[in-house]
C-alpha cells in the first residue's frame, strides 16, 4: 500500500468466541475487526521481507485505526441498520427457541454462583433470583438458591453463548 505495509487477509482464528476482544462486539450487533501487527520486539526486528521498527508498527496501527473510523463514518447508516437488524433477529431467535430461560445456582458454593452472576451483570445480562421451588430434569432448585436468566432479551446472542 501507500505506506509500505504488507497484508494478510485470511481469517485464521475463531471469531465466534466472545472472549476475544475483537469478536466480543459481534455478540452485541457490532462488527469485530482484528488488526494484527508483527512485533518489532523492541526498537527493530529483521524479518525475511523488511526490517520492522517500533515506529513502523505504531504507524500501521494508527493508519488502520484512521481507515476504520473513516469507513465507519462513511457507512454509518448501513451500520445503524445492521445493528438494528441484529437485535431484531436476536429477538426473533429467542422467541423461536424452545429454551425460555436458563436456571443456575450452586447451593454448596455460593461464591461460585455470585462470581458467575457478577460476570453476567458485567455483560448486561439480566439475572433474577428465584422466588419459588422448581424441579427441572429431576433436579430440585430451592427458593433463593438459584437464579434465572430469561432468553427473550435483546442480547439473546450473548446469553445463548454464555450458557451453551
Regions found by a protein language model. Name each.
Residues 1-6, 11-17, 21-164:
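Intrinsic-disorder/low-complexity accessory segments
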Amino acid at each position: 500500500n501507500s505506506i509500505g505495509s504488507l497484508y494478510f487477509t485470511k481469517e485464521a482464528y475463531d471469531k465466534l468466541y466472545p472472549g476475544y476482544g475483537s469478536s466480543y462486539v459481534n455478540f452485541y450487533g457490532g462488527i469485530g475487526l482484528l488488526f494484527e501487527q508483527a512485533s518489532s520486539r523492541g526498537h527493530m526486528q529483521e524479518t525475511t521481507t523488511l526490517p520492522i521498527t517500533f515506529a513502523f508498527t505504531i504507524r500501521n496501527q494508527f493508519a488502520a485505526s484512521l481507515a476504520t473510523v473513516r469507513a465507519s463514518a462513511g457507512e454509518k447508516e448501513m451500520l445503524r441498520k445492521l445493528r438494528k437488524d441484529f437485535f431484531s433477529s436476536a429477538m426473533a431467535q429467542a422467541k423461536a427457541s424452545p429454551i425460555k430461560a436458563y436456571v443456575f445456582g450452586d447451593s454448596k458454593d455460593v461464591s461460585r454462583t455470585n462470581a458467575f452472576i457478577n460476570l453476567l451483570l458485567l455483560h448486561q445480562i439480566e439475572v433474577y433470583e428465584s422466588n419459588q421451588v422448581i424441579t427441572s430434569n429431576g433436579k430440585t432448585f430451592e427458593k433463593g438458591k438459584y437464579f434465572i436468566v430469561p432468553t427473550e432479551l435483546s442480547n439473546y446472542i450473548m446469553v445463548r453463548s454464555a450458557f451453551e
